[in-house]
Regions:
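Short helix/loop segments within enzyme catalytic domains
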Residues: 1, 7-13, 88-156
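Charged, alpha-helix-enriched surfaces in structured cytosolic catalytic cores
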Residues: 48-52, 56, 69-73, 86, ...
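Conserved short-loop catalytic and cofactor-binding motifs
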Residues: 41, 98, 170
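Pan-zinc metallopeptidase signature
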Residues: 131-132, 136-212
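Short cysteine-rich clusters marking metal-coordination/redox-active sites
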Residues: 211-214, 226
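Short functional micro-motifs and their immediate structural scaffolds
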Residues: 216-221
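Peri-catalytic and regulatory segments of divalent metal-dependent proteins
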Residues: 1-71
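Post-HEXXH active-site segment of zinc metalloproteases
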Residues: 68-97
Length: 226
């Protein structure tokens, strides 16, 4: 539990209810409407080290920060409404596929929250742990090579109509992107000016630096360069 409050404070969100599910399968999820809560399984806690657990909790907090829980609830109600009205086929399925596409993009946003609290490398490591199991195996994974699989996948899926069709069929029902894609995207973002500037700004904010002009805690570039 002690991992959660500092993460919520850094992200500027109200601390949600937090539950431990006795389940050997490693997993975490965020849910609720008026009372938002995070659930982690005992299998996840046993598998992850402290940094990896922080990355996963920050990912779940990202769903709260970005209001994914509310949007997902509205989307599910919309889908249930279409089903209840008997609206199928040409209307309901495109709506469902659009929601799943949004869900995959939302996961990438939350991976960024995890990297802000820890680092892109820790986020990638936590994904390796979830995908491959114990440290004796996952510590040997070359993250750059794993991310390269996503590039190879992109080349294949863009090579002709048939491959595009296969890719569409393979991903259309997924709520999460493929792990290799998530690793590539978070490592790529970790090299971006946006991420580096953001981390500089957060570091300056945490140190209490103030702008010499307005005497306020700020993300002023002049202050950050000192």
């Amino acid at each position: 539990y002690n991992h959660l409050p500092p993460i919520c404070e850094k992200l500027g969100i109200k601390e949600p209810e937090f539950y431990l599910e006795m389940n050997p399968m490693p997993n975490a999820h965020t849910s609720g409407d008026t009372r938002v809560f995070i659930v982690v399984t005992s299998g996840l806690v046993e598998m992850m080290d402290d940094e990896e657990l922080d990355a996963i909790l920050a990912h779940e907090c990202g769903h709260i920060l970005c209001r994914h829980v509310v949007y997902n609830m509205v989307a599910n109600y919309l889908k249930m409404g279409l089903d209840a009205l008997g609206i199928l086929g040409s209307v309901a399925k495109p709506v469902e596929y659009a929601l799943l596409y949004w869900s995959r993009k939302a996961e990438l946003s939350c991976d960024r929250c995890g990297s802000i609290i820890t680092s892109p490398e820790v986020v990638a490591r936590s994904m390796a742990r979830l995908a491959g199991g114990p440290k004796s195996i996952t510590n040997k994974i070359n993250m750059q090579e794993w991310a390269l699989q996503a590039d190879n996948y992109d080349q294949i899926k863009n090579d002709g109509l048939w491959n595009k069709t296969l890719q569409f069929a393979a991903t259309i029902g997924l709520t999460h992107p493929f792990s290799a894609v998530r690793v590539r995207e978070i490592l790529k973002w970790g090299e971006s000016p946006q991420y580096k500037n953001l981390m500089q700004n957060l570091k300056a904010e945490a140190s209490g630096k103030k702008c010499p002009k307005c005497n306020k805690r700020t993300w002023c570039k002049k202050v950050l360069k000192k």
